[in-house]
């Protein structure tokens, strides 16, 4: 690889932010970074959706094909953007390293934290922060399709809105189903019933899921095509 790529929160215009990529050529002395890719949209702090959170930003970069990299983008809490097929926020993108043109690989994402491509089986594995509960491990094995795979956010999630939920001393979610946030984002407890791809695994409560990678046979021969992922939080059993 001739370049170094760095993901940053970027002010595309005054008080309007997205997650973008800076790139620098390899150098043994110093690095000069320029803007390589910025999505076609940004989220204003004071927006008509009425919510903004800079931590819902995605920003994971991963190797993909010879001429492309993978990149995850968040919606900065403007949840509806994840279901807009013309908007590049709330997506996993394939970005051409020569032209910086992006193609939407999958949509319906909240906040992808881990991202890896397994070339042998042509699969993308990703991890995703849910809201209060509902952290996910997702598999996209439909990469040759013209239509992006849709993982359902914010229509479906196994978590709950922070404004409407709390954890009991035993670790169970206590939910206020009358919270008005559900009018904007219902978080149905099924993905497939609404035409979306189910997560391979999900965690309730959340575990603070983070990076993910696949194990290749030449590393551990008995674990070929296994995945390893990290967690920053609690140790709970997965479902799915």
Language-model features and meaning:
Residues 75-240:
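Beta-propeller domain segments
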């Amino acid at each position: 690889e001739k370049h170094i790529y760095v993901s940053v929160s970027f002010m595309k215009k005054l008080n309007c932010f997205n997650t973008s990529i800076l790139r620098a050529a390899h150098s043994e002395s110093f690095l000069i970074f320029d803007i390589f890719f910025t999505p076609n949209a940004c989220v204003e702090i004071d927006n008509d959706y009425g919510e903004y959170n800079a931590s819902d930003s995605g920003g994971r970069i991963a190797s993909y094909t010879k001429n492309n990299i993978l990149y995850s983008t968040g919606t900065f809490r403007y949840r509806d953007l994840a279901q807009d097929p013309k908007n590049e926020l709330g997506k996993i993108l394939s970005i051409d390293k020569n032209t910086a043109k992006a193609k939407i690989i999958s949509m319906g994402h909240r906040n992808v934290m881990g991202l890896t491509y397994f070339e042998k089986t042509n699969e993308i594995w990703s991890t995703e922060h849910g809201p209060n509960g509902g952290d996910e491990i997702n598999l996209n094995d439909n990469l040759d399709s013209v239509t992006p795979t849709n993982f359902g956010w914010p229509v479906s999630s196994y978590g709950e809105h922070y404004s409407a939920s709390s954890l009991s001393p035993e670790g169970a979610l206590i939910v206020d189903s009358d919270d008005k946030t559900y009018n904007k984002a219902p978080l149905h407890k099924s993905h497939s019933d609404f035409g979306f791809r189910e997560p391979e695994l999900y965690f309730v409560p959340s575990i603070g899921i983070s990076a993910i990678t696949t194990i290749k046979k030449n590393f551990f021969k008995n674990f070929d095509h296994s995945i390893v992922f990290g967690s920053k939080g609690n140790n709970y059993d997965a479902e799915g």
